[in-house]
């Protein structure tokens, strides 16, 4: 029998030993398939080829072995495990490789038992097919075992790794499952009978017979993705899923599905916040920012999955599929590496760089030249469309698809689709080099390149009505020269006259943001600094400076209860983070500054913590202004500014009611 539709998820059911027929270590896969004719989901089995004992051992590496005291051993163990899982998913028989392509319209051939896939047919001009199904949303709360903060004090790895070394666990919990408005509550104290009865609201549970064995198939009803909030503890998520697994398979005379987990908490220095369950449950899990206020549509959900280009990011570069090119791509002798896609490039002839111990490097520039910020809106998208088949790419009309996300997608091509990766990087590099050279002829020097598509230029004061058209013309001519393309890139240019600055550390402040309408403390601070610099070019106008800081503090005060105004993203293990419950620091996280230059986790959906140190943010702006002052004035003005900074803080300290 044939069935038309698309694969929504492909996973492993188990690695089976058929003792009777002497077939050992045979992986049996489970495919969640959407029938386009009946608009329904089905689970089918696929029998793979025998795998080696060595591969199975690596796939089966336990958490206990991963969380070793030696960090190098931990990295080696999780690397071996993830690489082996990827080999299992992409390196087995051809039918498995075909089924690993999600959301592609295809035809599956079933055998006579109607639940085993024996062949797959994909059209040569494969097209995307996104089934219109709503996601499941999971929300959890729970309590954790106690752990001494003294055990979490050193900075060699994330708090998550330190906690798991000491058997940190969830003691009790409650959670809810919600699909399209149907919400059911669960508790860790409930009986298996109650749990199973509730799960039947969301899943179809059937028993299949294959190779003289019984297999329990758990198929979601009209959803293939589980969404959880970006601030949910990953240990809590793992505990809840394991709880459901135990209740589903307890006392069942069936071959148990494997059940394992890969996520950022397994890596000692953290990783991307992407989780993958090996075996049960056979669905996607996606972490969503501010899920309480905005549930993504099906197009956005499918786009996020397509951007994995295979398995979630936490499985590393081996989790990316091999992508064919739409054009003939040459072999490269001089191979660019991942460093070529660095998200921040700076011109050392213009920008000063300071190395800061146990923190991110600081880059800064102060000058009296005009500032031009050229945003090359769609060059990365255009290159992907040029070299990558459309069926591997997301829908670019989705506002979620930003250039920095596409850069991550390109970086994932590095290992298995290296020729495409090299071609794209080579073209971006050649285009930027051509464009920067053209701008140099206009007396414009580049300072920063952010995310390979935003370029900051400085130059002598000229008529912007002359410079702006020349910049656009330069982009178009360089693009045509390098790509030989008639397509005109979309370009946005921001012009800031006068006295400009840029300061990049853990926060990014720049005069380029003075026209921004976004509500964030860095925008307010940038506007204050721009006004202070402009008012102090001949002599330091301390009265004017005080007034500008006073206005900044007034805006700070008006936003003092808005957590989105204060929170920033921080990379795992880069800063000292106060002790917190759960595993919340193993991936990029939101936080605010507290006293003694420490961070405290701040969830988007929770009220702003009363431990925030508002004065820290004022001091950051004062320190940047003092740094500028040293480049232009004497120690006398600097000393006066130090006194002024102290006065600004003392005059406004009580207004924030700092504890």
From Swiss-Prot:
Broad class of where this protein is predominantly found: host cell
Name one cellular component (GO) term. host cell nucleus
Q: Name one Pfam family in it.
A: Herpes_HEPA
Give the location in the cell: Host nucleus
GO BP terms: namely: DNA replication; viral genome replication
- UniProt keyword terms in alphabetical order: DNA replication, Host nucleus
- Family affiliation: Belongs to the herpesviridae HEPA family.
Q: What does the UniProt record say this protein does?
A: Component of the helicase/primase complex. Unwinds the DNA at the replication forks and generates single-stranded DNA for both leading and lagging strand synthesis. The primase synthesizes short RNA primers on the lagging strand that the polymerase presumably elongates using dNTPs. The primase-associated factor has no known catalytic activity in the complex and may serve to facilitate the formation of the replisome by directly interacting with the origin-binding protein and the polymerase.
Subunit structure, briefly? Associates with the primase and the helicase to form the helicase-primase complex. Interacts with the origin-binding protein. Interacts with the polymerase catalytic subunit.
This chain's protein is named DNA helicase/primase complex-associated protein
* Classification lineage: Viruses, Duplodnaviria, Heunggongvirae, Peploviricota, Herviviricetes
């Amino acid at each position: 029998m044939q069935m038309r539709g698309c694969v929504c998820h492909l996973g492993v059911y188990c690695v089976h030993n058929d003792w009777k027929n002497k077939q050992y270590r045979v992986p049996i896969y489970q495919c969640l398939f959407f029938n386009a004719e009946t608009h329904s989901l089905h689970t089918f089995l696929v029998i793979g080829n025998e795998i080696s004992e060595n591969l199975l051992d690596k796939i089966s590496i336990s958490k206990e072995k991963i969380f070793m005291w030696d960090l190098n051993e931990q990295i080696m163990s999780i690397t071996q495990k993830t690489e082996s899982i990827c080999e299992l998913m992409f390196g087995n028989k051809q039918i498995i490789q075909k089924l690993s392509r999600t959301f592609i319209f295809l035809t599956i051939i079933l055998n006579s038992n109607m639940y085993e896939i024996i062949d797959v047919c994909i059209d040569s001009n494969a097209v995307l097919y996104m089934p219109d199904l709503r996601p499941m949303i999971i929300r959890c709360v729970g309590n954790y075992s106690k752990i001494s903060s003294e055990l979490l004090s050193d900075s060699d790895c994330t708090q998550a790794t330190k906690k798991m070394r000491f058997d940190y666990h969830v003691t009790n919990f409650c959670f809810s499952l919600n699909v399209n408005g149907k919400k059911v509550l669960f508790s860790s104290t409930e009986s298996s009978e109650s749990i199973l009865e509730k799960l039947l609201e969301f899943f179809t549970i059937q028993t299949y017979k294959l190779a003289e064995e019984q297999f329990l198939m758990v198929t979601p009803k009209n959803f293939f993705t589980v969404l959880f909030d970006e601030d949910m503890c990953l240990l809590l998520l793992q505990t809840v899923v394991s709880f459901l697994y135990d209740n589903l398979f307890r006392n069942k005379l069936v071959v148990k599905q494997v059940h394992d987990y890969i996520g950022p908490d397994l890596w000692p220095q953290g990783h991307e916040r992407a989780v993958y369950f090996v075996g049960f449950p056979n669905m996607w899990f996606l972490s969503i920012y501010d899920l309480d206020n905005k549930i993504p549509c099906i197009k956005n959900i499918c786009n996020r999955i397509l951007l994995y280009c295979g398995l979630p990011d936490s499985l590393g570069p081996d989790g990316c599929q091999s992508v064919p090119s739409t054009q003939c791509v040459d072999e490269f002798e001089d191979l660019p590496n991942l460093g070529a896609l660095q998200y921040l490039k700076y011109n050392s002839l213009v920008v000063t760089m300071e190395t800061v111990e146990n923190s991110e490097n600081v880059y800064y520039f102060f000058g009296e030249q005009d500032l031009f910020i050229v945003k090359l809106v769609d060059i990365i998208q255009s290159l992907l469309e040029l070299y990558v088949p459309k069926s591997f790419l997301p829908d670019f009309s989705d506002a979620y698809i930003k250039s920095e996300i596409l850069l991550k997608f390109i970086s994932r091509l590095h290992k298995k689709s290296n020729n495409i990766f090299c071609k794209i990087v080579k073209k971006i590099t050649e285009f930027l080099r051509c464009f920067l050279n053209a701008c140099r002829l206009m007396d414009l020097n580049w300072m920063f390149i952010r995310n390979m598509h935003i370029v900051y230029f400085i130059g002598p004061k000229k008529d912007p009505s002359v410079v702006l058209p020349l910049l656009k013309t330069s982009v178009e001519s360089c693009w045509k020269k390098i790509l030989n393309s008639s397509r005109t890139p979309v370009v946005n240019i921001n012009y800031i006259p006068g006295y400009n600055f840029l300061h990049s550390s853990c926060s990014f402040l720049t005069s380029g943001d003075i026209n921004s309408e976004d509500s964030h403390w860095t925008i307010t601070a940038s506007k204050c600094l721009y006004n202070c610099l402009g008012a102090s070019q001949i002599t330091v106008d301390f009265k004017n400076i005080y007034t500008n800081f006073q206005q900044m503090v007034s805006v700070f005060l008006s936003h003092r209860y808005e957590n989105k105004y204060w929170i920033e993203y921080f990379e795992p293990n880069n800063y000292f983070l106060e002790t917190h419950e759960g595993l919340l620091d193993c991936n990029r996280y939101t936080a605010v500054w507290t006293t003694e230059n420490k961070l405290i986790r701040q969830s988007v959906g929770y009220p702003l913590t009363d431990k925030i140190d508002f004065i820290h943010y004022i001091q950051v702006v004062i320190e940047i202004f003092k740094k500028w002052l040293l480049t232009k004035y004497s120690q006398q003005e600097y000393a006066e500014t130090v006194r002024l900074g102290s006065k600004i803080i003392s005059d406004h300290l009580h207004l924030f009611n700092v504890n």
